[in-house]
A protein has these predicted regions:
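Sec/Tat signal peptide C-region and signal peptidase I cleavage site
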Residues: 18-23
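A local structural motif
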Residues: 63-73, 92, 193-201, 219-223, ...
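Bacterial N-terminal signal peptides that target proteins for export
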Residues: 1-8
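Non-catalytic positions within long, well-ordered alpha-helices that form the structural scaffold/packing
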Residues: 82, 89, 160-161, 217, ...
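Hydrophobic alpha-helical
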Residues: 102-113, 207, 214, 221-243
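Beta-alpha junction/loop-to-helix N-cap segments that form part of ligand/metal-binding clefts
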Residues: 25, 40-47, 55, 59-132, ...
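Short beta-strand segments enriched in small/hydrophobic residues
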Residues: 25-42, 99, 167-171
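Extracytoplasmic ligand/sensor domains, especially the bilobed periplasmic-binding protein
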Residues: 93-198, 248-267
Length: 268
């Protein structure tokens, strides 16, 4: 219901303030990783958007117009995201529910801003998205998700306090999202008085992280904070268990997918 009211209000506001012509339906492009290893996130996007559209339409639509969804796949790839954004604008769509990954949202936002389209990202947390929009004077670029620096302000000090004296490792997957949130947590954890014993990036999509697991064993890691997504997190945890290594894994809510448990197995 919250998403329904935000979407409805945003569309209504842009309708009243901008010279946008509408037919019987209002098209909203829902953009995310509909295929690929992060497709579960895209599926969540689709289901959430459909529930919101159904509720809005059942209540009479927006100013009498019905919501129609256009599902687009960017696979969380920045280049594909820009291509998708250009296609959406070429098709005359003015309302975008997406993108998911910060690395996709940031470059795509420039395309939407130039066209005066409303972009609301439900999942992109890198501060650059809205900071760049504010600096450039793009009022139609928005996020519905907590920024990395806000997440770091909470998680970093908590780790510093709870795991004082422990061996903490911070990893990320090189993405705008993963590195952004990992760096935010690292900075506030350090300010809180705890220094990590190891900080590094992994290569996402790999099937064998045994070298990393060996490194974690050598470091006697007690805690691993991972800025990234569930496929790699589950695999690292499973392969660690196979080498009899146990540690406390801490992640943002990108871990919240049934696939994490499928990949991690009993180690999860």
């Amino acid at each position: 219901m919250k998403k329904m009211s935000i979407l409805s209000a945003a569309i209504f506001g842009l309708m009243m303030s901008a010279p946008v012509a509408f037919a019987d339906d209002i098209t909203v492009s829902v953009v995310g990783p509909m295929t690929g290893q992060l497709a579960t996130i895209g599926d969540q996007f689709k289901q959430g958007a459909q529930a919101a559209a159904d509720a809005i339409n059942a209540a009479g639509g927006v100013n009498g117009s019905m919501i129609k969804l256009d599902i687009e796949d960017d696979q969380c790839d920045p280049k594909q995201a820009v291509s998708v954004a250009n296609r959406i604008i070429a098709n005359g769509v003015k309302f975008i529910d997406g993108h998911a990954c910060s690395g996709s949202s940031i470059p795509a936002s420039a395309v939407y801003a130039e066209a005066g389209a409303l972009m609301m990202s439900p999942a992109s947390s890198n501060p650059v998205l809205t900071d760049a929009a504010a600096k450039s004077g793009w009022p139609t670029i928005m996020r519905l998700y907590t920024r990395d620096d806000a997440q770091g302000a909470f998680i970093g000090p908590w780790i510093a306090k709870k795991y004082a004296g422990k061996n903490v490792v911070i990893l990320h997957d090189k993405s705008a999202y993963g590195q952004g949130v990992a760096d935010a947590v690292r900075a506030t954890m350090n300010t809180g008085g705890l220094k990590e014993v190891y900080y590094d990036a992994i290569n996402p999509g790999e099937k064998d992280y045994s070298a990393l697991v060996t490194k974690l064993k050598d470091l006697k890691a007690d805690v691993v904070y991972f800025g990234g997504y569930h496929p790699e997190a589950g695999l690292i945890l499973r392969q660690s268990a196979e080498q009899n290594l146990k540690f406390q894994l801490i992640m943002p809510d990108s871990i919240a997918s049934p696939e994490f448990w499928q990949v991690a197995g009993p180690a999860g």
